[in-house]
Protein backbone atom coordinates (compact mmCIF):
# COMPACT_ATOMS: atom_id res chain seq x y z
CA UNK A 1 0.00 0.00 0.00
CA UNK A 2 1.60 3.27 -1.12
CA UNK A 3 0.52 6.78 -0.17
CA UNK A 4 1.45 10.08 -1.76
CA UNK A 5 0.70 12.99 0.55
CA UNK A 6 0.49 16.47 -0.96
CA UNK A 7 -0.24 19.84 0.61
CA UNK A 8 -3.71 21.33 0.87
CA UNK A 9 -2.87 24.24 -1.39
CA UNK A 10 -2.44 21.91 -4.36
CA UNK A 11 -5.81 20.24 -3.91
CA UNK A 12 -8.88 21.30 -5.89
CA UNK A 13 -11.19 23.41 -3.72
CA UNK A 14 -14.91 22.69 -3.94
CA UNK A 15 -15.98 26.19 -2.94
CA UNK A 16 -19.65 26.98 -3.25
CA UNK A 17 -20.81 23.36 -3.29
CA UNK A 18 -23.45 22.30 -0.77
CA UNK A 19 -24.11 18.83 0.56
CA UNK A 20 -26.76 17.12 2.62
CA UNK A 21 -24.31 14.47 3.75
CA UNK A 22 -22.74 12.27 1.12
CA UNK A 23 -19.88 12.00 -1.37
CA UNK A 24 -19.16 14.52 -4.11
CA UNK A 25 -16.91 13.03 -6.79
CA UNK A 26 -14.80 14.90 -9.31
CA UNK A 27 -14.66 12.19 -11.98
CA UNK A 28 -12.00 13.87 -14.09
CA UNK A 29 -9.48 14.15 -11.25
CA UNK A 30 -10.64 11.10 -9.28
CA UNK A 31 -11.30 13.18 -6.14
CA UNK A 32 -13.96 12.35 -3.55
CA UNK A 33 -15.08 14.91 -0.95
CA UNK A 34 -17.06 13.55 1.98
CA UNK A 35 -19.70 15.63 3.77
CA UNK A 36 -20.81 14.60 7.26
CA UNK A 37 -24.43 13.65 7.96
CA UNK A 38 -24.52 15.42 11.31
CA UNK A 39 -26.70 14.74 14.37
CA UNK A 40 -24.65 11.64 15.29
CA UNK A 41 -25.87 9.75 12.22
CA UNK A 42 -23.38 7.09 11.15
CA UNK A 43 -21.12 8.43 8.40
CA UNK A 44 -19.49 5.09 7.66
CA UNK A 45 -21.57 4.30 4.52
CA UNK A 46 -20.35 7.52 2.90
CA UNK A 47 -16.79 6.84 4.00
CA UNK A 48 -16.94 3.38 2.52
CA UNK A 49 -18.27 4.79 -0.75
CA UNK A 50 -15.46 7.36 -0.94
CA UNK A 51 -12.77 4.78 -0.21
CA UNK A 52 -14.26 2.44 -2.80
CA UNK A 53 -14.57 5.04 -5.57
CA UNK A 54 -11.34 7.00 -4.99
CA UNK A 55 -9.20 4.59 -2.99
CA UNK A 56 -7.14 3.45 -5.99
CA UNK A 57 -4.98 6.24 -7.38
CA UNK A 58 -7.30 9.00 -6.18
CA UNK A 59 -7.70 11.66 -3.52
CA UNK A 60 -10.17 11.64 -0.63
CA UNK A 61 -10.98 14.88 1.19
CA UNK A 62 -12.55 15.28 4.62
CA UNK A 63 -13.10 19.08 4.92
CA UNK A 64 -11.97 20.79 8.10
CA UNK A 65 -15.44 22.16 8.97
CA UNK A 66 -16.95 18.67 9.18
CA UNK A 67 -17.52 16.40 12.20
CA UNK A 68 -18.00 12.73 11.35
CA UNK A 69 -19.75 10.14 13.53
CA UNK A 70 -18.12 6.71 13.30
CA UNK A 71 -20.77 4.17 14.25
CA UNK A 72 -19.50 0.98 12.61
CA UNK A 73 -16.17 -0.64 11.80
CA UNK A 74 -14.25 -0.19 8.56
CA UNK A 75 -11.15 -1.67 6.94
CA UNK A 76 -10.67 -0.25 3.43
CA UNK A 77 -7.89 -1.48 1.15
CA UNK A 78 -6.19 1.54 -0.41
CA UNK A 79 -3.53 1.93 -3.08
CA UNK A 80 -1.60 5.01 -4.17
CA UNK A 81 -4.11 7.31 -2.49
CA UNK A 82 -3.89 10.77 -0.95
CA UNK A 83 -6.09 11.36 2.09
CA UNK A 84 -6.57 15.00 3.10
CA UNK A 85 -8.09 14.51 6.52
CA UNK A 86 -9.01 17.78 8.21
CA UNK A 87 -12.38 16.95 9.69
CA UNK A 88 -12.93 15.56 13.16
CA UNK A 89 -13.85 11.91 13.66
CA UNK A 90 -15.74 10.87 16.80
CA UNK A 91 -16.28 7.20 17.56
CA UNK A 92 -19.74 6.27 18.82
CA UNK A 93 -20.30 5.48 22.49
CA UNK A 94 -22.11 2.20 21.80
CA UNK A 95 -19.88 -0.01 23.95
CA UNK A 96 -21.77 -3.24 23.28
CA UNK A 97 -21.39 -2.87 19.52
CA UNK A 98 -17.72 -1.99 19.79
CA UNK A 99 -16.90 -4.92 22.07
CA UNK A 100 -18.58 -7.42 19.77
CA UNK A 101 -17.87 -6.06 16.29
CA UNK A 102 -14.33 -4.69 16.27
CA UNK A 103 -11.56 -6.41 14.32
CA UNK A 104 -9.74 -9.01 16.47
CA UNK A 105 -5.99 -8.72 17.08
CA UNK A 106 -4.30 -11.86 18.38
CA UNK A 107 -1.55 -9.95 20.19
CA UNK A 108 -2.66 -9.52 23.82
CA UNK A 109 -6.30 -10.31 22.93
CA UNK A 110 -7.03 -6.79 21.68
CA UNK A 111 -9.39 -5.37 19.08
CA UNK A 112 -9.33 -2.61 16.48
CA UNK A 113 -12.20 -0.32 15.54
CA UNK A 114 -10.74 1.27 12.43
CA UNK A 115 -7.86 0.42 10.12
CA UNK A 116 -6.75 2.91 7.47
CA UNK A 117 -4.07 5.46 6.61
CA UNK A 118 -4.27 9.23 6.32
CA UNK A 119 -2.85 12.73 6.70
CA UNK A 120 -3.76 15.67 8.96
CA UNK A 121 -6.01 13.61 11.19
CA UNK A 122 -8.07 14.38 14.27
CA UNK A 123 -9.77 11.40 15.90
CA UNK A 124 -11.98 11.57 18.99
CA UNK A 125 -12.18 8.02 20.33
CA UNK A 126 -14.93 8.89 22.85
CA UNK A 127 -12.72 7.12 25.38
CA UNK A 128 -14.19 8.71 28.49
CA UNK A 129 -17.23 6.46 28.11
CA UNK A 130 -14.88 3.48 28.35
CA UNK A 131 -12.74 4.91 31.16
CA UNK A 132 -15.75 5.58 33.37
CA UNK A 133 -17.44 2.26 32.62
CA UNK A 134 -14.36 0.19 33.51
CA UNK A 135 -12.87 2.39 36.28
CA UNK A 136 -9.30 1.24 35.78
CA UNK A 137 -10.02 -2.46 35.17
CA UNK A 138 -9.59 -3.08 31.44
CA UNK A 139 -12.05 -5.52 29.90
CA UNK A 140 -11.85 -7.38 26.62
CA UNK A 141 -13.30 -5.65 23.58
CA UNK A 142 -12.01 -2.09 23.99
CA UNK A 143 -11.00 -1.11 20.43
CA UNK A 144 -7.88 0.69 19.29
CA UNK A 145 -9.05 3.77 17.38
CA UNK A 146 -6.44 3.70 14.64
CA UNK A 147 -4.04 1.15 13.13
CA UNK A 148 -1.68 1.26 10.16
CA UNK A 149 -1.76 -2.35 8.94
CA UNK A 150 0.29 -3.69 6.00
CA UNK A 151 1.44 -0.29 4.74
CA UNK A 152 4.56 1.22 3.20
CA UNK A 153 5.84 4.65 2.15
CA UNK A 154 3.54 6.56 4.52
CA UNK A 155 3.91 10.16 5.70
CA UNK A 156 1.69 11.41 8.54
CA UNK A 157 1.75 14.92 10.01
CA UNK A 158 -0.39 17.01 12.37
CA UNK A 159 -2.29 14.03 13.76
CA UNK A 160 -4.34 14.27 16.97
CA UNK A 161 -5.97 11.36 18.80
CA UNK A 162 -8.26 12.40 21.66
CA UNK A 163 -9.48 9.98 24.35
CA UNK A 164 -8.59 6.67 22.66
CA UNK A 165 -10.41 3.67 24.19
CA UNK A 166 -7.21 1.60 23.92
CA UNK A 167 -3.81 2.01 22.21
CA UNK A 168 -3.84 5.35 20.41
CA UNK A 169 -1.81 4.98 17.24
CA UNK A 170 -0.39 1.67 16.09
CA UNK A 171 1.74 0.18 13.35
CA UNK A 172 1.27 -3.47 12.45
CA UNK A 173 3.40 -4.51 9.49
CA UNK A 174 4.69 -1.15 8.31
CA UNK A 175 7.75 -0.14 6.28
CA UNK A 176 9.25 3.27 5.54
CA UNK A 177 6.92 5.44 7.59
CA UNK A 178 7.43 8.99 8.84
CA UNK A 179 5.38 10.66 11.57
CA UNK A 180 5.72 14.30 12.64
CA UNK A 181 3.79 16.50 15.07
CA UNK A 182 1.63 13.81 16.67
CA UNK A 183 -0.46 14.41 19.80
CA UNK A 184 -2.32 11.78 21.84
CA UNK A 185 -4.35 12.63 24.95
CA UNK A 186 -6.20 10.13 27.15
CA UNK A 187 -7.58 11.95 30.18
CA UNK A 188 -10.43 10.65 32.33
CA UNK A 189 -12.68 13.46 33.51
CA UNK A 190 -14.37 11.25 36.14
CA UNK A 191 -11.42 9.48 37.80
CA UNK A 192 -10.61 10.57 41.37
CA UNK A 193 -7.26 12.29 41.81
CA UNK A 194 -4.44 9.76 42.00
CA UNK A 195 -6.40 7.02 40.22
CA UNK A 196 -5.44 5.78 36.77
CA UNK A 197 -8.55 4.96 34.75
CA UNK A 198 -6.77 5.31 31.41
CA UNK A 199 -4.52 2.25 31.50
CA UNK A 200 -3.76 0.54 28.16
CA UNK A 201 -4.09 3.84 26.30
CA UNK A 202 -0.53 3.62 24.96
CA UNK A 203 0.46 6.52 22.75
CA UNK A 204 2.58 5.58 19.76
CA UNK A 205 3.70 2.06 19.05
CA UNK A 206 5.17 -0.40 16.63
CA UNK A 207 2.97 -3.35 17.06
CA UNK A 208 4.60 -5.87 14.91
CA UNK A 209 5.83 3.73 18.63
CA UNK A 210 2.57 5.38 18.91
CA UNK A 211 2.83 0.84 19.23
CA UNK A 212 5.06 -0.83 16.61
CA UNK A 213 5.16 -4.48 15.56
CA UNK A 214 6.69 -5.97 12.42
CA UNK A 215 7.85 -2.43 11.65
CA UNK A 216 10.92 -1.40 9.64
CA UNK A 217 12.34 2.07 9.05
CA UNK A 218 10.02 4.15 11.22
CA UNK A 219 10.70 7.79 12.09
CA UNK A 220 8.78 9.76 14.72
CA UNK A 221 9.47 13.41 15.57
CA UNK A 222 7.70 15.93 17.79
CA UNK A 223 5.38 13.63 19.72
CA UNK A 224 3.36 14.59 22.81
CA UNK A 225 1.46 12.07 24.94
CA UNK A 226 -0.69 12.44 28.03
CA UNK A 227 -2.25 9.29 29.44
CA UNK A 228 -1.91 6.34 31.74
CA UNK A 229 0.27 3.74 30.03
CA UNK A 230 3.32 3.49 27.77
CA UNK A 231 4.02 6.74 25.97
CA UNK A 232 5.76 4.80 23.19
CA UNK A 233 6.08 1.03 22.87
CA UNK A 234 8.36 -0.80 20.50
CA UNK A 235 7.14 -4.35 20.19
CA UNK A 236 8.30 -7.57 18.44
CA UNK A 237 10.15 -7.48 15.14
CA UNK A 238 10.72 -3.74 15.03
CA UNK A 239 13.90 -2.63 13.26
CA UNK A 240 15.49 0.74 12.48
CA UNK A 241 13.29 2.94 14.64
CA UNK A 242 14.29 6.60 15.08
CA UNK A 243 12.40 8.77 17.59
CA UNK A 244 13.20 12.37 18.57
CA UNK A 245 11.62 15.20 20.56
CA UNK A 246 9.06 13.50 22.78
CA UNK A 247 7.09 14.66 25.82
CA UNK A 248 5.42 12.03 28.03
CA UNK A 249 2.98 13.33 30.66
CA UNK A 250 1.88 10.57 33.04
CA UNK A 251 1.85 6.87 32.28
CA UNK A 252 4.74 4.51 31.84
CA UNK A 253 7.47 6.17 29.80
CA UNK A 254 9.24 4.73 26.74
CA UNK A 255 9.17 0.93 26.47
CA UNK A 256 10.91 -1.63 24.33
CA UNK A 257 8.50 -4.49 24.88
CA UNK A 258 6.95 -6.39 26.13
CA UNK A 259 8.78 -9.03 24.11
CA UNK A 260 8.70 -12.82 24.20
CA UNK A 261 5.07 -13.18 25.27
CA UNK A 262 4.43 -15.69 22.48
CA UNK A 263 6.39 -18.62 21.06
CA UNK A 264 7.99 -16.65 18.25
CA UNK A 265 10.96 -14.47 17.37
CA UNK A 266 10.41 -11.19 19.21
CA UNK A 267 13.59 -9.34 18.24
CA UNK A 268 14.03 -5.56 18.29
CA UNK A 269 17.17 -3.99 16.82
CA UNK A 270 18.61 -0.60 15.91
CA UNK A 271 16.52 1.88 17.89
CA UNK A 272 17.28 5.48 18.86
CA UNK A 273 15.10 7.48 21.25
CA UNK A 274 16.49 11.00 21.77
CA UNK A 275 15.41 14.22 23.51
CA UNK A 276 12.61 13.10 25.82
CA UNK A 277 10.80 14.78 28.72
CA UNK A 278 9.21 12.48 31.32
CA UNK A 279 6.71 14.40 33.48
CA UNK A 280 4.79 13.03 36.44
CA UNK A 281 1.03 13.71 36.32
CA UNK A 282 -1.84 12.76 38.64
CA UNK A 283 0.65 10.88 40.85
CA UNK A 284 1.19 8.57 37.89
CA UNK A 285 4.55 8.17 36.14
CA UNK A 286 6.03 4.72 36.55
CA UNK A 287 9.05 4.43 34.27
CA UNK A 288 11.24 6.66 32.17
CA UNK A 289 12.92 4.30 29.66
CA UNK A 290 12.86 0.54 30.00
CA UNK A 291 13.20 -2.82 28.28
CA UNK A 292 10.83 -5.63 29.28
CA UNK A 293 10.80 -9.25 28.14
CA UNK A 294 8.80 -12.26 29.24
CA UNK A 295 10.08 -15.29 31.13
CA UNK A 296 11.31 -18.25 29.08
CA UNK A 297 8.49 -20.70 29.80
CA UNK A 298 4.76 -20.90 29.25
CA UNK A 299 3.24 -19.61 32.47
CA UNK A 300 -0.51 -19.64 33.25
CA UNK A 301 -2.04 -16.17 33.02
CA UNK A 302 -5.37 -14.82 34.21
CA UNK A 303 -5.49 -11.38 32.56
CA UNK A 304 -7.72 -10.64 29.59
CA UNK A 305 -4.62 -9.70 27.55
CA UNK A 306 -3.57 -13.35 27.59
CA UNK A 307 -7.10 -14.58 26.89
CA UNK A 308 -6.67 -16.97 29.81
CA UNK A 309 -3.87 -18.81 28.00
CA UNK A 310 -0.32 -19.44 29.24
CA UNK A 311 2.26 -17.05 27.80
CA UNK A 312 6.02 -16.61 27.64
CA UNK A 313 8.84 -18.54 26.03
CA UNK A 314 9.53 -16.24 23.09
CA UNK A 315 13.09 -15.73 21.85
CA UNK A 316 15.25 -13.28 19.94
CA UNK A 317 17.67 -10.38 20.33
CA UNK A 318 17.23 -6.93 21.81
CA UNK A 319 20.30 -5.01 20.72
CA UNK A 320 21.69 -1.72 19.49
CA UNK A 321 19.27 0.42 21.49
CA UNK A 322 20.09 4.04 22.44
CA UNK A 323 18.07 6.10 24.93
CA UNK A 324 19.62 9.57 25.15
CA UNK A 325 18.99 13.04 26.57
CA UNK A 326 16.12 12.32 28.95
CA UNK A 327 14.80 14.91 31.41
CA UNK A 328 13.02 12.98 34.18
CA UNK A 329 10.56 14.82 36.44
CA UNK A 330 9.30 12.44 39.09
CA UNK A 331 9.03 9.03 37.42
CA UNK A 332 9.08 6.14 39.88
CA UNK A 333 12.14 4.67 38.16
CA UNK A 334 15.01 5.66 35.95
CA UNK A 335 16.28 3.59 33.00
CA UNK A 336 15.93 -0.14 33.57
CA UNK A 337 15.86 -3.65 32.13
CA UNK A 338 13.40 -6.28 33.38
CA UNK A 339 13.29 -9.75 31.83
CA UNK A 340 10.76 -11.29 34.21
CA UNK A 341 7.39 -10.22 32.77
CA UNK A 342 4.68 -12.81 33.38
CA UNK A 343 6.62 -14.43 36.22
CA UNK A 344 4.53 -16.16 38.88
CA UNK A 345 7.47 -16.47 41.27
CA UNK A 346 8.93 -19.68 39.83
CA UNK A 347 10.60 -18.54 36.58
CA UNK A 348 12.86 -15.65 37.54
CA UNK A 349 15.84 -15.30 35.21
CA UNK A 350 14.53 -17.75 32.61
CA UNK A 351 13.98 -15.39 29.66
CA UNK A 352 15.12 -16.67 26.25
CA UNK A 353 15.65 -13.13 24.94
CA UNK A 354 19.24 -11.87 24.67
CA UNK A 355 19.70 -8.20 25.61
CA UNK A 356 22.95 -6.52 24.53
CA UNK A 357 24.49 -3.27 23.31
CA UNK A 358 22.11 -1.00 25.21
CA UNK A 359 23.06 2.62 26.02
CA UNK A 360 21.30 4.94 28.46
CA UNK A 361 23.00 8.34 28.04
CA UNK A 362 22.52 11.79 29.57
CA UNK A 363 19.61 11.28 31.97
CA UNK A 364 19.00 14.19 34.35
CA UNK A 365 16.35 14.97 36.95
CA UNK A 366 14.84 12.99 39.80
CA UNK A 367 12.71 9.95 40.56
CA UNK A 368 9.89 9.47 43.07
CA UNK A 369 10.17 5.76 43.77
CA UNK A 370 10.82 6.14 47.49
CA UNK A 371 14.18 4.35 47.33
CA UNK A 372 17.79 5.32 46.69
CA UNK A 373 17.89 2.82 43.80
CA UNK A 374 16.96 4.71 40.65
CA UNK A 375 17.89 2.07 38.03
CA UNK A 376 17.59 -1.72 37.97
CA UNK A 377 18.94 -4.29 35.53
CA UNK A 378 17.40 -7.74 35.92
CA UNK A 379 18.23 -10.01 32.99
CA UNK A 380 18.39 -13.76 32.31
CA UNK A 381 20.41 -16.65 33.67
CA UNK A 382 19.89 -18.40 30.33
CA UNK A 383 21.23 -15.46 28.29
CA UNK A 384 22.87 -12.95 30.66
CA UNK A 385 22.74 -9.43 29.25
CA UNK A 386 25.96 -7.64 28.32
CA UNK A 387 27.28 -4.32 27.05
CA UNK A 388 24.72 -2.36 29.05
CA UNK A 389 26.07 1.19 29.33
CA UNK A 390 24.96 3.93 31.73
CA UNK A 391 26.66 7.09 30.48
CA UNK A 392 26.05 10.27 32.50
CA UNK A 393 22.86 8.96 34.10
CA UNK A 394 22.54 11.53 36.89
CA UNK A 395 19.23 10.98 38.65
CA UNK A 396 18.40 11.95 42.22
CA UNK A 397 16.09 9.70 44.30
CA UNK A 398 13.72 12.56 45.10
CA UNK A 399 13.14 16.16 44.13
CA UNK A 400 15.11 17.49 47.10
CA UNK A 401 17.68 14.67 47.42
CA UNK A 402 21.32 15.70 47.76
CA UNK A 403 22.95 12.42 46.66
CA UNK A 404 22.62 10.72 43.31
CA UNK A 405 20.75 7.44 43.08
CA UNK A 406 22.36 4.02 42.76
CA UNK A 407 21.57 0.85 40.85
CA UNK A 408 21.06 -2.87 41.30
CA UNK A 409 21.82 -5.73 38.91
CA UNK A 410 21.25 -9.48 38.63
CA UNK A 411 21.50 -12.14 35.95
CA UNK A 412 24.01 -10.07 34.00
CA UNK A 413 27.20 -11.22 32.29
CA UNK A 414 30.48 -10.74 34.16
CA UNK A 415 31.27 -7.05 33.65
CA UNK A 416 28.17 -6.75 31.50
CA UNK A 417 26.96 -3.47 33.01
CA UNK A 418 29.06 -0.29 32.99
CA UNK A 419 28.59 3.09 34.62
CA UNK A 420 25.87 2.13 37.13
CA UNK A 421 26.96 2.42 40.75
CA UNK A 422 26.05 -0.71 42.68
CA UNK A 423 26.55 -3.07 39.74
Curated annotation (Swiss-Prot):
| Positions of glycan attachment | 100, 120, 150, 173, 185, 245, 344, 362, 400
Q: Which cysteines are joined by disulfide bonds?
A: 231-248, 379-385, 409-423
Instruction: Name the residues annotated as catalytic in the UniProt entry.
Output: 229, 252
E.C. number, please?
3.2.1.67
Q: What is this enzyme's catalytic activity, as reactions?
A: [(1->4)-alpha-D-galacturonosyl](n) + H2O = alpha-D-galacturonate + [(1->4)-alpha-D-galacturonosyl](n-1)
Localization, UniProt: Secreted
- GO CC annotations on file: extracellular region
BP-aspect Gene Ontology terms: cell wall organization; polysaccharide catabolic process
Instruction: Check the record and name the Pfam families matching this protein.
Output: Glyco_hydro_28
Named from the GO MF annotations, one term is: polygalacturonase activity
Q: Which domain of life is it from?
A: Eukaryota
Q: Please list every transmembrane segment annotated in the UniProt record, as residue ranges.
A: none
Asked whether the keyword Cell wall biogenesis/degradation is assigned, the reply is yes
Tell me where the signal peptide lies.
1-20
| The family this protein is said to belong to | Belongs to the glycosyl hydrolase 28 family.
Q: What is this protein called?
A: Putative galacturan 1,4-alpha-galacturonidase C
Amino acid sequence: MRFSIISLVSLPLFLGLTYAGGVEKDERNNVCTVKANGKQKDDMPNLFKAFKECGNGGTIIFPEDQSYWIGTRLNPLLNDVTVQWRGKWTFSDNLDYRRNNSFPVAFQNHRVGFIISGHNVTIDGNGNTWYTAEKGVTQSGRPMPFVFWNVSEVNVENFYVKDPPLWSLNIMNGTNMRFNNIYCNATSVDAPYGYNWVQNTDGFGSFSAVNTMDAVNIQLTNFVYQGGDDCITIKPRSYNIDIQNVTCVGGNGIAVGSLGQYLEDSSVENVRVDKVKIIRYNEDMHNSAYIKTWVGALVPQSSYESAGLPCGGGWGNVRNILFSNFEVQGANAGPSVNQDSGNNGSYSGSSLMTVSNIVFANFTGYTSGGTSVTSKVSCSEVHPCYNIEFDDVLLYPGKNASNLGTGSCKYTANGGVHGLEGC
